[in-house]
Amino acid sequence: MPSTRNIETHNDSNPTLRALSLSALGIVYGDIGTSPLYTFKTVILLAGGGTPDVTTIMGSASLIIWTLIIIASVKYICFALRIDNDGEGGILALMSLLSLKLKQKPFIIAVGLMGAALIYGDGTITPAISVLSAVEGLEILSPSLKYYVLPIAITILITLFAIQSKGTATIGKAFGPVMAFWFLTIGILGAREVIQHPFVLAAINPVYGLNFLFSNGATGFFILCGVFLCVTGAEALYADLGHFGTAPIRCAWFGLAFPSLIFNYLGQAALVLEGASTEHNIFYMLCPSDFLLPLIILSTVATIIASQAIITGAFSMTRQAMQLGWLPRLRVTQTSSEGYGQIYIGVVNWLLMLATLGLIIGFGSSEKLAAAYGIAVSATMLCTSVLLFIALHKLWKWNIIKSGLVAGLFMIVDASFFAANLTKFINGGYIPITLAIIIYSMMYIWHKGYKTIAIKQKEKNITVDSFLDSIQKEGVVRVPKTAVFLTSKEQDIPPTLVWHVKKNHVLQDKVIILNINNLSIPWCKPGDQLQIVETGAGIWHAVANYGFMEQPHIPKLLKKLETQGYDINIKDITYYIGHETIFVRNVRHTLSKYIKILFVFMHRNALPMSNYFHLPPESVFEIGRQIEI
């Protein structure tokens, strides 16, 4: 289990803390760490481009610095990291925690799912804009190389997505040191300019940012779109909590990432104050010409690492959604035995690749991609702030005024950024929003469809006593074998068991009726994973408990019964599972009909139960049945 919540990391001399902090630099801070490649340039362009005046430069730098302080440092580092679901973070984990302990489930779930869906929308743009902005440095090296930027970026991304199925555990060990070198490099490049123009340090005063924001009318409002790009990776601070723990993430942020980012943004501001052209990438202009090519290579590697973190995060969130019952079963492949987070989901990988390549080809440059970037992640952050308010008030027991003052500040800032980013909707912002709506709809349809099936199954429930009476009256022959019947929690006796007895008139002398119970916590304690009770006549009711970060493996779990003294041979088990064919009856309401048809389509294309639960194919017996919805 990769969670490090039980590791003592409070002592700064602890080597574990240093190692985890280094790893966190590679996984957690890739996205936010590569934002200097395009953020300051975008802000200056939104402010009018050309040769900006001192007020514009200082105001832009001040807004970026204070956005990093309020959103990344205070909201996520100081508050969000302290609200975990058994050590796990992220909007789905927070949603599960609140819905488990509080009564406002529909609202909490709606906000959480929309936030999660929006992350997918953002995930398609991040690899595209990151890699493209890095490779665009070639244009500064030689203007004739601009024709190679797009092909190189496309090649890099295709290669990145293609190797996902092989796993990235080995090269992943280098992510931390590479990103540490990246942060040191961008910090030093920025510090060089700050030392030469110390006046730029005045931008740390928030008055510069506020004056610039409120004295420029609509322009000041639009500039927030560019400013927000500096924190687009902040949600990862929270989502990766379970992989590293609070202390390493904070140590990596305040120890290296945050000061390096501040110095780099101030350095870019100092460079423009000096009169540098804003037509080219300001970030690369910080670098001496002799070191430009190595910096371009380093930038490209850093953006690949940032993209890898987004892809891995998409896999992890998809698994969480499946386990929580919000997405259909998909094939999850463990690519490394060293880390549970090293997984691969083919459908997600290839859909992300197609969307990312489509964006690169469609927009053609990082400057144009910036028009589509930010709207989805700003909406996600607003959703997180809403859930944080509920957590502060209900879980921490803060009074509503205190909760409102803290979370209200975050919501005002997030809402301002979201409103500003909405102006990008027509210019490309509609793409991630549309994608988020599609994914949210899929989650809603899947959950609603399975809820409908569960209600129907409950209506046809057969009690254990009535089943035992029936097999006794009919004189069913018992054979010396073991059978496992998978069932839902709505049923005492699964239809597959009833059908088996009715058609074959025989029943194994040892029968386990197994219910898979997906919990709203990330990890189930080993001692609670399998609960079994004998109901009589050689029939046991068992419950297999799995957290939303765990991958069910039924044979491995049942093997525990052998070690606990049960007379069961795991190699002698026959697994009986239902193969449902869902069909839609005549429905007058068109919308309801199409929702059900979409559910049927998703159900038919879901991974078979036997594959998802890792059942041995030679020991599986599928029993078909039709269900009308």
Curated annotation (Swiss-Prot):
It catalyses: K(+)(in) + H(+)(in) = K(+)(out) + H(+)(out). Pfam families: K_trans, K_trans_C. One of its GO terms (molecular function) is symporter activity. Its main location: membrane. Keywords: Cell inner membrane, Cell membrane, Ion transport, Membrane, Potassium, Potassium transport, Symport, Transmembrane, Transmembrane helix, Transport. It is a multi-pass membrane protein. It is found in: Cell inner membrane. The chain crosses the membrane at residues 20-40, 54-74, 106-126, 143-163, 171-191, 212-232, 253-273, 291-311, 343-363, 372-392, 400-420, 425-445. InterPro entries: K+_transporter (IPR003855), K_trans_C (IPR053952), K_trans_N (IPR053951), Kup (IPR023051). GO terms for cellular component: plasma membrane. PANTHER family: K+ POTASSIUM TRANSPORTER (PTHR30540:SF83), OSMOTIC STRESS POTASSIUM TRANSPORTER (PTHR30540). Belongs to the HAK/KUP transporter (TC 2.A.72) family. Transport of potassium into the cell. Likely operates as a K(+):H(+) symporter. This is Probable potassium transport system protein Kup 3. It comes from Legionella pneumophila (strain Corby).
